[in-house]
Amino acid sequence: NDTLNMLYEAGLKMEAKDFAVGLRVCHEQEKINLSQDGEKYYQSLPAASYKLTHNTDSGIGVYSFCMCPGGYVVNASSVSGLLSINGMSNHDRGGRFANSAIIMTVGRDDFPKDEGVPECMRGVAVKEELERKAYVIGNGAIPYETLGEYKEGVLGKHSHEMNITDDFRFEPDEAFRGQTMHAPVHEILPDKLSRAFLEGMENFGHRIKGF
């Protein structure tokens, strides 16, 4: 962001472009293996991956990106007061959880018409605002919640989903690297993108059981 601002102030000719934003989702790697490889083979094959896409009724494309088998969600922030995350897998892809970004396109027509921000920098302003929200709700840590909580827009209403059965316990340290906080992730994205995210997740759930 600082680099783009510096180049703009130096007089470099610039123009706005569409970009993608989204959220990272985590699932037990074993469930992904079972869905992708089948019951007969899933225990003997390496950690499975997936690639998912969906075009929403509103015309927004939703797709998985940078899927990390047996990996971790990591804090990739580089600017004070802003939060961005990424995913990674170790060489053995041996982590208990898989994760991937589920992202949506933000078009130039979606950029706010803020007269105080140059037109070519309005996409950067959108990105910074989302990263600022993420930082605030997580108090600088990686915020997380269940999909049920996200759907209802109420933190804590579906927290039991993290501990569904005696053989499933969600421990943040097994899915994340860095500090975490159970927080209202549903407050980050604007409504238009949030609805697209949920529609995409519902579609993906019909293709990978439990997604």
Language-model region placement:
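Residues forming the flavin
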Residues: N1-F211
